[in-house]
């Protein structure tokens, strides 16, 4: 039997190897409910039909063949991927909601609730695959049917279970059994390609579900994220402090600048920066401002009349003689200005002028080297030497005898005076310092006379 059954089976059954995954199989011999259903069915999944009744997908081969050759002849079906539930807490909540919803249903639906709960437990343990064997009461044409379980979110899965809506959806039977059997047969290559496509679609759905789940966080996670660690709080406080310090420094600098400007504007008390300007009753118009080209006029230390003004009648020019240098002057009009004499207590305006004089040097007296010749007769001199010289020229020469007598008399008088002084000095005991200078005078005057004789 085994060899004949293998020979009768198609090629895709021979090349198939059973996957090492836990599978859920539902078996029956006919479309109608049979007495062997409860004993032989391991587990079944509810499938929605047009009438709304639960239909169990069964294999039409005989139960005896399947029981004898369970390991050899297994029909290849498309693996249905059940998406794994993301968090364990949500899995537990979903299982509790399933049990509560099943408790309120009738006895007829208890089997379905048990199936849903077992499938949910299997999904918690891992991504176990579900295998379904289906046929349309034809033993020669096994049919594969796609069964997709959509569990994008645990909450949606629980709502569907509580509202008595089946979680497992199948494609409705619209075609005839023959057309389905022909269209459902695929080569192994097509089966492998279909599995790869399903895997890629599962990956895409996983990524989309993950993207949907990430923005929708639970309030616990939001509260955790809103809670800051002490380090983060300290950093935030330090940032606020630095901002406050920067603001304070900015305000301090602005205030300091305002204070400095006020200090510059306000003069210090007791300073001589401000003086009252006094205008005399009569303004002096005799003062002149002079501008000199060339050599500067040095009037330092000079007092009194330093120069003279020469005005020619013919040309109408005015010449100014300053310390021997003659300057040609030209009057140039200008803006009104004043000469101010600044003192310790006040500033007094001494002159107001509307023009100034520009000087151009013409000639110098010292450069001309002029000589002046003449006699000094008739001039008297106060010095003794000059008076003696004048007397010598006027006195006539006298006799020699008279001159000798005068000389002897002049010599005898100082000797007698010297003897008297010594006697008086001894008697009185006083020094003779007072009478020594006249003796020197006599000595000095004695030699002058012989010079005059010569």
UniProtKB/Swiss-Prot annotation:
UniProt KW keywords: DNA-binding, Nucleus
Places the protein is found: Nucleus
GO cellular component: DNA topoisomerase type II (double strand cut, ATP-hydrolyzing) complex; nucleus
Basic residues bias spans: 438-454
Region feature (Disordered): 24-53, 103-249, 380-454
Phenotypic effect of disruption: Plants show a severe dwarf phenotype. In bin4 mutants, a specific DNA damage repair checkpoint is activated preventing further progression of endoreplication cycles.
Residue spans of biased composition, Basic and acidic residues class: 112-123, 229-249
Free-text tissue specificity from the UniProt record: Expressed in expanding cotyledons, vascular cells, elongating root cells, developing leaf trichomes, root and apical meristems and lateral root primordia.
GO BP annotations, alphabetical order: chromosome organization; DNA endoreduplication; epidermal cell differentiation; positive regulation of cell growth; root development; shoot system development; trichome morphogenesis
Record InterPro entries: BIN4
UniProt key word Protein transport: no
Bias (Polar residues): 132-150
GO terms of molecular function: double-stranded DNA binding
Summary of the function given for this chain in its UniProt record: Component of the DNA topoisomerase VI complex. Binds to DNA. Required for chromatin organization and progression of endoreduplication cycles. The loss of BIN4 activates the ATM- and ATR-dependent DNA damage responses in postmitotic cells and induces the ectopic expression of the mitotic G2/M-specific cyclin B1;1 gene in non-dividing cells.
Subunit details: Interacts with TOP6A, RHL1 and itself, but not with TOP6B.
Protein's UniProt name: DNA-binding protein BIN4
